[in-house]
C-alpha cells in the first residue's frame, strides 16, 4: 500500500513528543510523564478530502516497537539552536478580514488558533509586517512623505494604518495567549530612503542607514506602547526578490553594513533586546546569512 507522505508527516510530528528511539537500536523510550496510552494525530491527504483533521483513533504507544514506523532518532547530546515557537504570518489583509468578522466568530477562530483548550492549535509565534506587506490593501510605511522631503529624526513616525486592523487583532490574540512571541519583518523602508524613491524594488541609501535604524527602534517602542512586545525583527523580507509592492533588494554586504554601522548600535543605545534575524527568505542560499 502506498504511503501518503502528508498523512505520515502529521503522525510523525505528533509522535515525536511521546516516543523516540536512541542510537542503540532496539530500545524504545516512552515519555511516562504524559501518562498517555495513545498518541493523537491530525491527518491531511493529497486529495484534500482531509485537511489537518483530527483522527478518532490514535497510535497505541504501548505497542510501538522499533521498525513499526520509520524511526525518529533523537540524540540528546547533539544540541542546535533553541526553538522560539511555532506559528505563522498575520498580514494586514488577514487582520482586516478578521476585524470585519462578527465578534463571536472572530473570538472562536482566535481561540482555536491561539488558545490553550484541548481543541486549540496553540500557535505560539507570529510574524507581522513592519509597514505594509504585499498582501495589504495598499503599500505604506510608518513615515511616508511627499516627494523631496526627508525625516531622519523620525518626527513623523506613526503606526498609522496598522492601528485600524492589525494592532486591535494582535491585542485580542495577546489576551488569549499572553506569552506569544511576535516577529516584525519589513517589506520596504519609506520610499524616500531608497535609490529609486519607489515602494517597489530599489536599495537602501547608505546616508539613511541611521534613519532606518531609528525607524526600527521607533517601531519596537511604539508597539510596546500599544502593549505588543516585538521579540525579533528581520532586516528585509525576501531581500533578493524585489518585484512585489512593496519590496526592496538588499545584498548580504548591504545587510551586514547596515547592522554593524547603524542598527546594532541603535539597539544597544536604546536598550532594545529584540533578536535580529538574518536572510528572511527560503533556506536555499546559506551563504547569505553566513556572510552576514
Kindly give the residue locations of the regions a language model identified:
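Conserved beta-strand positions
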Residues: 128, 184, 235-238, 278-281
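Bacterial N-terminal signal peptides that target proteins for export
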Residues: 2-10
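Bacterial Sec-dependent N-terminal signal peptides
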Residues: 18-35
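N-terminal zymogen propeptides
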Residues: 30-62
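Bacterial N-terminal signal peptides
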Residues: 10-19
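N-terminal catalytic cores of secreted or lumenal carbohydrate-active enzymes
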Residues: 52-230, 251-253, 261
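Active-site neighborhood of glycoside hydrolase catalytic domains
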Residues: 211-218, 222-229, 239-292
